């Protein structure tokens, strides 16, 4: 009998029943909620008179709409200027209070982005099924968990039944071997992958990231890669459990204690793909060949190494792709064959659920220390992923490094990742962003987003345009 992949093992453990149409009923261990996709779900429960099936399986925090300036974070929710944002945060508070859900409220030091606080609190554990009304829930797969985003109607289903009806996916292995060159990060790995297979390359697959390069990454690096599995078209991204996983989880507030911990660890160590497991697709990358990446277009697959140029649509033989390239270049205000290093920046954003953890901030601070943000850059901001990340950075003095360089040091939240709060781009502005999506209007109407690693964003802030961070730090 053939061995099983990690995904298949987790699926089998959580499959409650198989239905005649081929779908399955899957049990959900952890449900994380935020203010945007939960209001209608709670209202549905009230209208149907349904209680929560398992209250303590849920945790919540506001993140998408919360302002990130101190002025709007002091005092009550009335300090939130935007009425819609204020209503959504207030509604989450009321729903969590009414249904008894543990919430890290806006001014709780533990508040932060859902995909930062889940692992940080130990609410995300190996072997779990984890869902959230947010597509980047794949982040939690870095812990050997089966994690994916769900829609608002599914949020209600999980609250009411702790189960979901879903289809099993195919298995894809992304194997990355070798040692990453200095200055090349997990963000560059996943952008290079998306550039190779495209944003549809992972459609219908659960992706397991493996190989010596992945094993060498920290847990925070693994979270970055799993976070953007969705940009490669996959609903699920995951990494097998190893000692790094176990050490990261140990001692965190929601993690098991005592004999429960010992039993959990014994189980977790088996959460790896068997040596003879079959994958439906295998993609291989060589770490040594990966360079710092920069997106130049309006899709994550429109990406090049920093020492390359914007492509020329005239060289594209596929008419559909050619038209897509022409539209992207027009929107981005770029010309064919422009060097990536010629792209000038108006704003720089270091944050988001992709790259706002302490290691990300350390990497950026290392670049800007003793330097200044270029006078041509209108705004450079650092938005920690949680209050605890912010506090740790301040203990290490990272906030002072950023402020002295000319960065704004903000409160935690999703911030400029998406135009759903006060942090937005103006039309036509170019932004070096450590977030995960560069669609038209993602960071503001007419805004032009370039996805990069924290170190590359920091270097761009100093230079005023894209540069190879390896050259700057040489």
UniProtKB/Swiss-Prot annotation:
Identify the keywords attached in UniProt to this record, alphabetized: 4Fe-4S, Amino-acid biosynthesis, Branched-chain amino acid biosynthesis, Iron, Iron-sulfur, Leucine biosynthesis, Lyase, Metal-binding
Reactions mediated catalytically:
(2R,3S)-3-isopropylmalate = (2S)-2-isopropylmalate
Tell me the superkingdom of the source.
Bacteria
Q: What is this protein called?
A: 3-isopropylmalate dehydratase large subunit
Query: Entry's Pfam families?
Result: Aconitase
Physiological role? Catalyzes the isomerization between 2-isopropylmalate and 3-isopropylmalate, via the formation of 2-isopropylmaleate.
Keyword Hydrolase annotated: no
Q: Name one GO biological process term.
A: L-leucine biosynthetic process
- From what organism does this protein derive? Xylella fastidiosa (strain 9a5c)
Q: Which CDD domains match?
A: IPMI
Membership in a protein family: Belongs to the aconitase/IPM isomerase family. LeuC type 1 subfamily.
């Amino acid at each position: 009998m053939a061995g099983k992949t990690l995904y298949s093992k987790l699926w089998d453990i959580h499959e409650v029943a198989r239905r005649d149409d081929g779908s399955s009923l899957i049990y959900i261990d952890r449900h994380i909620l935020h203010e945007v996709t939960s209001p209608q779900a709670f209202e549905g429960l009230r209208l149907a008179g349904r209680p929560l099936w398992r209250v303590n399986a849920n945790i919540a925090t506001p993140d998408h709409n919360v302002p990130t300036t101190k002025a709007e974070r002091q005092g009550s929710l009335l300090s939130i200027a935007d009425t819609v944002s204020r209503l959504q945060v207030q509604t989450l508070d009321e729903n969590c209070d009414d249904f008894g859900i543990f919430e890290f409220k806006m001014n709780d030091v533990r508040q932060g982005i859902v995909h930062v606080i889940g692992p940080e609190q130990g609410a995300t554990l190996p072997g779990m099924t984890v869902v959230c009304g947010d597509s980047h829930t794949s982040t939690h797969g870095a812990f050997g968990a089966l994690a994916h985003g769900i829609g608002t109607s599914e949020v209600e289903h999980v609250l009411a039944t702790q189960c979901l009806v879903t289809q099993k996916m195919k298995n894809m292995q992304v194997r990355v071997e070798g040692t990453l060159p200095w200055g090349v990060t997990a963000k560059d790995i996943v952008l290079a992958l998306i550039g190779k297979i495209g944003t549809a390359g992972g459609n219908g697959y659960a992706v397991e990231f493996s190989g010596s390069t992945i094993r060498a990454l920290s847990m925070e690096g693994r979270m970055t890669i799993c976070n953007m599995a969705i940009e490669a078209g996959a609903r699920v991204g995951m990494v097998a459990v190893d000692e790094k996983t176990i050490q990261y989880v140990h001692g965190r507030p929601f993690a098991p204690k005592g004999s429960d911990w010992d039993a959990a660890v014994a189980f977790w160590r088996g959460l790896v793909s068997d040596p003879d497991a079959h994958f439906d697709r295998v993609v291989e990358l060589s770490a040594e060949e990966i360079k710092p990446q920069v997106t130049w277009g309006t899709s994550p697959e429109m990406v090049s190494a920093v020492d390359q140029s914007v492509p020329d649509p005239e060289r594209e033989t596929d008419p559909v792709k050619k038209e897509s390239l022409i539209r992207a270049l027009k929107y981005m205000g770029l010309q064919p064959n422009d060097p990536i290093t010629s792209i000038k920046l108006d704003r720089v954003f270091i944050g988001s659920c992709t790259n706002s953890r302490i290691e990300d901030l350390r990497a950026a601070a290392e670049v800007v220390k003793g330097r200044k943000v270029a006078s041509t850059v209108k705004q450079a901001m650092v938005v920690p992923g949680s209050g605890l990340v912010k506090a740790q950075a301040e203990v290490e003095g990272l906030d002072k490094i950023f402020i002295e360089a000319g960065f704004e040091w903000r409160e935690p939240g999703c911030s400029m990742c998406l135009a759903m709060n006060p942090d937005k781009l103006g039309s036509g502005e170019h932004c070096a962003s450590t977030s995960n999506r560069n669609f038209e209007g993602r960071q503001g109407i007419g805004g032009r987003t370039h996805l990069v690693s924290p170190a590359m964003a920091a270097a761009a802030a100093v230079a005023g345009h894209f540069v190879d961070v390896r050259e700057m730090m040489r």
